[in-house]
């Protein structure tokens, strides 16, 4: 939590064009205190958090790395809540099988499912014997993940978080993500992916899927609040210093919204090799 808070204070301050001195003046404290917050040496007093959040133009929840409350539910919050059963079904992605072959659970390995949706892949990993954590911005998605895990007789540490605000503090053997990178604000990509890479254990795996833009493919019909597809091949370059087990680009048909459309995607399996 300390690392997340430190990064958020620094980021939101810079987004406002404030110096450490400027923020300190707003709070009637010394700039040295702000500097210590941003380096993680100390944390703000709890009583000061509301004033700090106000000065930075965010909620206390967002400052602490939790998703802020939304007046308008996200597209998938509504989809998951109103689905008859599970919006994406309960059959795991083929990517799960590839991960299983690359790093089987011969010992208790830790997995983080980033943007887990309704939990079908997270629950699959738990059933295979992995120690699984998973997060999503959708309340309904998190609750359905927990329900699916209960039904399968396994445990998934499912929690709510916003991919743009949440930063890893624990280390994992496998980072897994399908179709969520497009929600990362472009100006935050470098920082977020660097944070992810720094929290993968040696010999660990990153298994990532990202939508990419193509001039010959129309934008998807889903009205997502944040949709920032990557450039073709961009995902691979973030892991140029890891061993690339496999990477590919493909185009596929989709009818998730009830309207037939196509997507282009890049898929990456990279191993942290020291």
Indicate where each model-derived feature is located.
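Short alpha-helical DNA-recognition segment
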Residues: 17-36
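Alpha-helical residues within the helix-turn-helix
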Residues: 14, 25, 54
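A short, Lys/Arg-rich alpha-helix, primarily the initiator
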Residues: 1-15
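Short catalytic micro-motifs in class I SAM-dependent methyltransferases
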Residues: 179-183
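DNA major-groove recognition helix of helix-turn-helix/homeodomain DNA-binding modules
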Residues: 47-62
């Amino acid at each position: 939590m300390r690392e997340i808070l430190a990064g958020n204070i620094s980021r939101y301050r810079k987004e406002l064009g404030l110096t450490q001195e400027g923020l300190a003046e707003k709070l009637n404290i010394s700039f040295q205190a702000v500097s210590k917050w941003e380096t993680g040496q100390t944390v703000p007093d709890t009583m000061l958090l509301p004033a700090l959040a106000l000065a930075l133009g965010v909620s206390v929840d967002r400052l602490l790395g939790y998703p802020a409350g939304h007046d308008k539910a996200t597209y998938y919050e509504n989809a998951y809540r109103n689905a008859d059963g599970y919006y994406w079904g309960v059959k795991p992605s083929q990517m799960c099988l590839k991960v299983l072959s690359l790093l089987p659970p011969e010992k208790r390995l830790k997995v983080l499912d980033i943007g887990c949706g309704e939990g079908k892949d997270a629950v699959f990993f738990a059933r295979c014997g992995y120690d699984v954590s998973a997060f999503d911005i959708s309340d309904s998605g998190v609750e359905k993940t927990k329900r699916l895990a209960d039904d399968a007789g396994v445990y998934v540490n499912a929690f709510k978080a916003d991919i743009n605000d949440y930063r890893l503090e624990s280390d994992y053997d496998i980072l897994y993500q399908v179709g969520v990178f497009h929600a990362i604000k472009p100006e935050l990509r470098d920082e977020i992916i660097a944070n992810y890479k720094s929290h993968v254990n040696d010999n660990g795996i990153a298994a990532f899927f990202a939508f990419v833009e193509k001039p010959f493919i129309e934008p998807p019909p889903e009205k997502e609040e944040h949709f920032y597809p990557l450039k073709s091949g961009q995902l691979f370059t973030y892991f140029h210093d890891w061993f690339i087990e496999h990477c590919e680009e493909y185009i596929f048909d989709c009818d998730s919204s009830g309207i037939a459309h196509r997507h282009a995607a890049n898929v990456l399996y990279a191993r942290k090799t020291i």
